[in-house]
């Protein structure tokens, strides 16, 4: 019922974009699915293709420093100082959420995550020209749990909680993100060289290790080794029940098929996934599509995983499939074990 949980989990990582923020006049949005390439890997120097798993907004600012200190009353304070582009009109820049990534080993990253998202007592804001800091009505929120944060597409018939568990145990770095909320309520001047936020912790920072701005990164987003592919056209044969799929124009010896996204016949019949139970033949679905497809993965002689396409449906049972029917497929590919 859930074949997607039996597939190989693709390679994943977190990338940091480094815009020339001093020259930016406004935020820049990068849509989900933006493609990045790895460094050359292996004997053939293959560049593995990764795509971003969510949209990211690059702001015209940078985190200049992050410093941990102690207030006169004994409370731990984290000071975050941001440098801002002099070309941006800051009264118009949307700062409703600034995402951060905890770029550290697991013990430090988890301690920082807990301090910011669960141990914050108060936030203070300091602007140029202010004699003293002012209270700020803001907070930090944990990221990575929303429907828009999924690392790979969710199956129609699966429970989203299972995917969260699978993502946590396979790529915990996805949940090492947090977002700063509340700056949209601040009235900034049109020209803003810098601003500073003091995060007062409810409980003292008792850990032996400290952190700097190197451990708190802006402009980061998860990426996964998935990318769009096309398959060689298939011509149906009445004597065949399975068809091995081959990516079109890919002969590098590393590319594998991760999913079959759509199947369309030359007579404009749409095949639906068997696991979606949207095909004709039961549950009073008289108007549903007459065709379905299913995939099976087998390891080939070369060690790569080959994907086989299995076709069925009421049209096949009644032998009403047109002769010389051909299929066009859209696929999602991966580089398999090569990037690991």
Model-flagged regions — what are they?
Residues 261-340:
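C-terminal accessory/interaction regions of large nucleic acid-associated machines
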Residues 1-131, 135-137, 141-144:
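Extended assembly-interface regions of large multimeric machines
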